[in-house]
Amino acid sequence: MALHARHLPSSLGDQAPHLLILHGLLGSSDNWQTLGKRYAASHHVWMLDARNHGRSPHDPIHTYEAMAQDVVDFMDTQGIAKASLLGHSMGGKTVLLLSQLHPGRVDKLVIADIAPRAYIPHHGPIFDALLATDPASAPSRDAVQSLLSKALNGDPVLVPFLMKGLHRLKEGGFTWRFNVPVLHATLQDVVGHIELGLNTLPALFIRGSESDYVSDDDLDLLEDHFLHMDHHTIQGAGHWLHAQAPDEFFAVTADFLA
């Protein structure tokens, strides 16, 4: 599958290393543009839309094996032999699997607020809300947002985040850029377990103190698998730590990637 990507060339020129950024579930490359510009001071930055997200193609298959292969195929197409990878949530699990299957293609990896374990799905209300909207016949963005807000109790973070995925159709009406039916049907795969082996790549695991996605026990388990591992906790940040604490997130990750 040919993924859509946003490219920010480095000011350092051709000798700069490559950094690929992979977003989380229901996100897109758009979520990373501000931080991407900062990383471009030292790296050629590629912000990818995962399959069934953003401007990348839709497909009934949505597994980590498929997503990891999509990234490798993208690197092959762009002539990128090796790159550092930064993944948040679903993107982080994709990076974990890719580093297991293709370690020679990875320089360093940054995993943002996710562990390889299986999670109990908690996205039911989100997908119920998305499936209940009929964006194709909606008269305005405000109408769609009103429906989402009502279904999600006016969540001040989640509703604006989801609305970023709403796209106006030329023929009128709207559509979701993310593939709601397929992502809903494959949610068990998205929250599933990633099998880890011994990994010798430099790895940074960064989490938010207010998020329950990465526990101390998770970090202990990860240290059994990653021989060269660092970890950092951003105090006061939740699961969307890169948006809630962008300066600290950038400082810690940029130092690691240098």
Where on the chain are the PLM-derived regions?
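Flexible "cap/lid" loop of the alpha/beta hydrolase fold
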Residues: 100, 107-139
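Catalytic histidine-centered segment of alpha/beta-hydrolase-like enzymes
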Residues: 237-250
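Conserved serine/cysteine hydrolase catalytic core
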Residues: 171-225, 230-233
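Serine-hydrolase catalytic-loop signature spanning alpha/beta hydrolases and amidase-signature enzymes
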Residues: 26-34
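Alpha/beta-hydrolase fold catalytic core
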Residues: 1-20, 40-43, 80-81, 188, ...
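Active-site loop/oxyanion-hole signature of alpha/beta-hydrolase fold enzymes
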Residues: 8-12, 33-40, 46-90, 251
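Active-site glycine-rich loops that stabilize anionic/oxyanionic intermediates
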Residues: 24-27, 89
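Conserved alpha/beta-hydrolase catalytic His-Asp/Glu region
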Residues: 121, 136-190
